[in-house]
Amino acid sequence: VGTGSLAGMRMLNKLEGQACRWPIENNTDDALTLVEIFPSFYFSLASVRPIKGNHARLDMLNKSLAFFGSNFLPNGFVPKGPDFDEADALVSSAAIRALSSKQEVWNMPACAIQEGWIFGVEYANNFI
């Protein structure tokens, strides 16, 4: 988390003026929008418990992808990365695509502007 935070801060500095940081800033011109994600949260929405690599099994990945309306991965697919990074990226991408079309996802409580917010949480609280 520490290393990722430091890398993220450097990237935010580099992207200053080129991207919107949601929910702190509103995207008014269809520019790049950066959102905070939490892959385990998206797996949980799909009723997959991301414990001890369970979420990286092909059947669990496909269950999660299907929940978000994405295609199945081919038989024999094995996610790469030391911490199942590819599995996390695949499901996060599917979740962002599926959730971003729902207007309620973009409407956050006032505290989110000061504290930040994980994309999809408020929607999920109403959904579950």
What are the functions of these language-model segments?
Residues 1-128:
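RNase H-like (RuvC/DEDD) metal-dependent nuclease/polynucleotide-processing core
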